[in-house]
Amino acid sequence: MKLALLLPGYLDSPDYLHLVTFDKRLTQLGYTVERLDLGDLWKTGDPAKYTVSHFLDQIRERIAYYKSQKPEEIVLLGHSRGAFTAIIAGSRLAGVTRVVALCPPADITQSAKKWINQGSRTSTKDVPDKPSESRTFSIPYAYVQDFLNYSVVEAVKTFHKPLMIFIALSDRVVPPEHTEQIVKSANNPHVVRQPNMGHDFRKSQADCDIVMSEIEKFLAQ
């Protein structure tokens, strides 16, 4: 069997359009797909397990769950900080065979400043399929402290599995030049530089389809 684990970006729901789109197409391609609610944040609203370290444990647990089925392929596909986590997990977990990193940040040095005086940071996210509704999450500084323990730029230096890095050239959240830092350190990555697309391509079905078509090309290699 072939397994694909989909990793949302910062505070993103696993039920956002892009992940649902990827799920449907990957299922058609014969993958068993799970869209992970990282740290169970959307399920519980509790940020206690919302750290990269817990995300890695969660990914490890899901891979172990399928071990008896002897998957010949395990793909980690993440967007934004989910892409960051996918690379870190892929570099550490032997069973992972491919990584798809969409708009991954090289670090969160600038974003960390949004946690004023190292307190909690409150953010609002739209509810899937209900754009007029929202949920609010308060993330403690412990998230930043944990995140800073990981370096994706260092991780890719010793990463020799197939790696796709997707760069949205109109991205203003994770500027292309930041993601290019990862590309420079990586070993022969499959790089897609998509013009006229921003970080939140999830809000457009057409853009989601474009991204999925690029993912499909990579998986077929």
Task: Give the ranges of each region predicted by the language model.
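Short, surface-exposed "cap/lid" segments of acyl-processing enzymes
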Residues: M1-G39
